Structure formats: C-alpha cells, structure tokens
Amino acid sequence: MSLVSEEIVQEILLSIAVTAHSEGGLLRPTLRSISAAISELARDGVSCELLIVLDNATAETSAEAEQWLAPGRVTASVRIVRSAAGDASASRNLATHYARGLYLAFCDGDDLVTSNYLQQAMLMLLEAQEPLIIHPSEVVSFGARSAIWKIPASESIDHRNLVRHNLWPSSSVSQRSTYESWPYSQLAPEGGFGPEDWLWNIETAIAGIPHRPAPETMFFYRVREFGGVNNRHVHSILPWFDLDGLIDALPLHSDPEPMTIQPTAPRSRRILRRGYRIVRPVARMVTAPLGQARREKIYSWVTRVSRPVNPAGLVSPRVEAVLREAAEIEPALSWTAYSYANLEHWNHSDDGYAALLVEIVANLKGHTEALVMVPWVGIGGADLVSINYAKALVEDERFHGNVSMLATYIPSRTIRHLVPTGVNFVQVPEKFRELSPDQQRRLMAQVLLLLKPEVIVSVNCFDLTNSLQFFGRQLGSASRIFLTLFAFDRIGAGYPVNPITDDSQRAFLTEIVAILTDNTVTAGIVQEMLALSDEKVRVHHQPALDPIPSLSIGTRAYNNRHFTPTNPFLLIWPHRLDKEKRPDTLIRIAEKLRSEGMPVEIHVYGQQVLSDDGESLMRSISAAGIKYRGPYQGGLMALPTHDFHALLLTSESEGLPLVLVQSMLLGLPVISSAVGGVTDIVHDNQTGLLTKGPDDIEGFTSAIRHLMDSLDDRRRIIRDAYDFAIAQHGWTSFSRLVDELT
C-alpha cells in the first residue's frame, strides 16, 4: 500500500537538492545516505528526484556528481544543475527553480542523513494543512568536534532564542512553494553576513511558518578543522531583519512541562498508509474548529524536544542501529558513534544577549539617523567633544529628532543633564559586561546593523572600535563611520596606546570614512603612523563655549599687579587626577615655587577617573601646600575663574584640550606643557606660555614669574588668546565641518 494517494503518485512528489562545490570525495557518503533515504520513500510509493547543484564545483566534485547519473544508482531520476554564483543562497534558490516536486528537501554536500529522515518528513508534510518546515530531530556533529544538538519546534521557543542562536540546521524539507515564496537572501561571502540559513529561519519564523523536527531522525554534520561553512561563518553576522516582526511571531511565553516526541512505529506507518485517505480528512475535521494557533499549541505540547538524556553508556538499540548504518556509509563517524552516550549536548541557553539586544534597539529606534557613541558623558575634554557633535547633529534639519547618544560604559560616570536638548540618550545596561568579549563585540555590531544609522561618530568609544575589528566590513557597508583620536595614552615607560592602534591588523580602517581629531599635530602623527591619506584624517577644531561671552576685563587676571603672601598669585589646575595629566608635576612645581619664596597658591579641581592611587596622591598634594577643591561639573564655566590669575596644564599627552580654549575665552591666561595639539592654540608668548614638557619644572616656574611680573604682557596675552579662540573655535565653522560628515 502506498504512502500517497494514487492520483498524485504519477508525478514527482519530492525533490532532494544536494548543494556542492569543493567536497570532492566527501560528496560520496552524502549521496549514499540520500540514496538510502530515497529508497525508503520508494518502498512507500513516493516518487522522487535528486538534484545535485554544482556551484563553482571543483573537477573532483563534478566528477563524483556525474557518477550518480548512471542508471540504477538511485531509485529516482537524477539531474545535475551547474552554477557559478559562489553563494549557498543562490545554489538553493537555483534548486528551487529547477525542482519539479511538490515538496523539496535540502542537504549540503558533505553532511549525511538517516534513511528515515525524508520518510518522516513526508509523513508530517502530507498531513499539514498549511506551510510547514521540517528538520531532523537531532544533529550529530563529527570530525573536528563531536556533539549532539536536539532540534526544537518553533512553538517551544521565543524570539530571544532565535536572535541568540541559529536553532535549526540548514537541512530542511517543506512544500516547494515555501522556498518559492521565501527564497534565501543572497549574502555574498565577501560581505561578511550570514549564515544565510539563519536569516532564512528568522524570515520564515516571522512569516508564521512552523519549524518542527521529524521524530527519530538524525542528521550528521561534518565539522572541519579548516575551511567549510562552520569556519567561514565564525565572524559572520546577521544583516538587517525585522526584529519587531520576530518578537510578534515568537513572543515570550512560559513553557509547559516538556514532553518527548513519540516515534512513529513501523506498524503505525503501515496503518497510516492504509488509511491515508480516511485519516487525513478526519484529522483535519477534528482540529479545524480549534484554529491554527490552538493546533500549534497542541503540537508544541506533543513535540517538545527537551528529552531526557541517556544515562552514560546506555544507547537504545534503535539509536545504535541508526548510528551503525551511518558509520557504514561514513567510517569517520565511528568514533563519534562509539562515544554517543557521553557526547556533549548543545542546548540553546539564555545568557542575556537577546534581552540586551532587544532593549537597546527599542530604546534607540526612531532616533538613530545619526548616532554619537561614547563610553560616558562627563566633564572631560572628550566629553565636551561628544556633546558638540550631538548638538551639531540634532540642530541639522536632516537629523532633527533622530539623533541619539549611546553610552556603553560605566553609567555612574555619566552626567545626564549635559546631554544636549533634543538628543535621545541611551545607556547600555551594566549586564552587557557580563557577556564574553566575543559576544559584546557581536551584540554591539548587531544593534548597529539592525538600526543602520546614516552617520556614526564614535568619540573614544572603545566598544565600537572592538566591534569594528571583527565586523568592520559589515558595519561600514551600513553606515558612514567616523572615529576620533585626539592623543595617545601612555603605559609603562611611555608606550603609546589607543583602541584604534591597539589592533595589530587595523583592517577596519579601510571601512570607516575618516578619523577625526581636533589638532594638526595629532593629525600629522596619525597619518604618518597609520599610512592614511589626507581624506582619511580630518581636523575639527571644537567649540568650547556656546554662547561665547564677551571678553571680561574685570577679572583678577586682567587687573592685579602686585602679589604678596597675603595676596598671592592664584593658579587653577582643573583636570583629571590621572597619570597622563601629571599631577606629580604639579607637586614638583609647588615645591619649587615654595623653595624660591614666590607668593603663589595652586588650587586643584577634579577627580580621579582611571587611576587608583587616590589616597597617597591626595596626601602628597596636601603636603606640597596645594589646595584641593574637589570635583566639579559643567566645565570651566562652573568654576570661579575670575578669581584666578592663570591656568596650568601639566599633561604628558593631549589632543587639543578644550579647557585651554575655554580658559582663553574666559580671559584666563594659559601656561601649558608643549604636548600634542596644545601648540595648535597656545603660541608661546602670544596666546599663552609654553614649557618644553611636563618635566620642565624650571620652564613652568619661569612662565609663572613672567605673568606675575608683567601685567602688560598678561593683558596682551589675554586679548590675543581671546581673539584667536573665537576665530578658530567658533560654532558656525564647526557646524559646517559636521555637515560634511553626511
């Protein structure tokens, strides 16, 4: 008795497509396993055809495929389809185009199936009233890695599972119309997107098509040490997909008690075949009033895939028979089969990745035509730069209302009121740091690919730089990306470090539009060091105050002429108390001034952010007679600068510190070490006074004495510095530069 009714037995019911390219002799065991599965269907009266799709196939692979054209090799018609697409999606879509069966199955050219796989799939599909996708119930990996992967039904998972893991293997069986209506998206291998079957699984799940495992079937997945799909997709990532649609299709739910899928016994199959014409209409009549959603819930209960694992050393006779059958076809399976009872079971687990992804995307969605990425938004110079870019972008009519700032690091360091009005601020939850570094990089990249901002400006956001190292091609294809590099931090004996240069390959530099810096000195260093063209490094002089105040001539700096111990010359040092700012130099300056009897008092504002020697540093500051005034917010404008006579900067490494620009606009002369981009704005004895570097204690002392002794020079420097800062660091010129980012 046939599995199918007589009226459809004359036409091809099932096409089986095997896709191959460079498998060579490994194609043999695949086709032998497919041939065995076809023979099982032939005994049930199911007419089949075998399509071997050769995509840019090697000569050895092509020769192996052609051997299967010989009559009697397979109990089905055999055709070879050739293509030069070099793409798995195109191969599968080509198979769909040429397939003649009402149903279609796919298998890659180096994997194996059990002889009952196609039979069990057809039993389920012939009973289906609507589109349905069948997979094997268990995937056994062999080769470079051995493991067992139980395949879930779509009714037993939610969107978080499918966002985090590709839950269904590339091998599937469905109505041919399913593959015609939802073809595989073509993802060029060089683009870095994929795997294509994961995207197809997502898209079909969004369409509401159930994915279900065929009971008691196995699929043997060959894992290669080198090459192969599994290695090619190590650094692949999913392209854009409809996340909202997936959430709607696979909502969160509480799972009922898991149940084992009951196998279809041979006797049951005989009964099914014999009563096929009766059983199908009865089954449909009984379940039809329940509706599709209810029928799927019932199926979910029955076909739950969380099954008890066999005790160590115990394998059922049925499984042993299946493994033995497969090993006779492919002996490379033997050691995996021998260890089957003790193999690691891969299970999709919830590590928080998907929940974080959904939360971040939801908070950013609708506000990401332009995106500024930062570690945090605080009071430092880089923080002001990030605020400048966010403000300029949100004021641009092309982006108004669609600009976000995404802070990825320590939330407590962000001062929310500093975020410009109209800018959507999103903080990455601290749980992000509980993910592995690999998953952090992937999640950040996936968020950006789902949102596809037109412009991304990263201001020292190391999380984006880390993602670019692995997903630069993909991110660069979706957005115009700009990174900032203002200066190098120093480690050890002064070795330069920066997230951009820490990556020894730096392949991502070809994928970004440009590196932004705020001074010509750093621009020149970066161009030479990284072998970048002029177009790849852009100098953006940053606004420091908005609005710009008129020059104040009522300050102590502009008017005080004589200084005594009771009326000292007051210096302000408003920086982070971290190593690169060289607070140790400040202590040495204070000791030098005291030893020479100069009536000078130094006031420190700021706090430690990156260093951890706070207590000992504060003791040394106090011992040197320096007055510590505590941390501050709101930039230099928040401090009583009119009470001071000059500002000190002692750093060993800087870009162009905006605190110097602010000081000039507020009428406070600057004494600074000549490092980094400082010389772009501080011209010695014109717009300020320079020392040779942070260790030039004598130079600092002489500069302080010069400003104390000459009120005329002090006033001249104040006026010239103010005019220079307005000309170089105005808001209008900066806005024009930001316009060029788009």
What are these regions (language model features)?
Residues 69-79, 423-429, 614-632:
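Nucleotide-activated donor-binding/catalytic signature segment of Leloir-type glycosyltransferases, i.e.
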Residues 652:
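Aromatic "clamp/platform" in nucleotide-sugar-dependent glycosyltransferases that forms part
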Residues 191-200:
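Acidic donor-binding loop at a coil-to-helix junction in glycosyltransferase catalytic cores
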Residues 669-672, 682:
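Short hydrophobic beta-strand element within catalytic cores of glycosyltransferases
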Residues 53-55, 405-412, 601-615, 628-630:
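Glycosyltransferase donor-sugar binding loop
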Residues 1-10, 240-244, 251-369:
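Non-catalytic membrane-proximal stalk/linker segments that position and tether the catalytic domains
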Residues 83-99:
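Glycine-rich, basic loop-to-helix element that forms the pyrophosphate-binding segment
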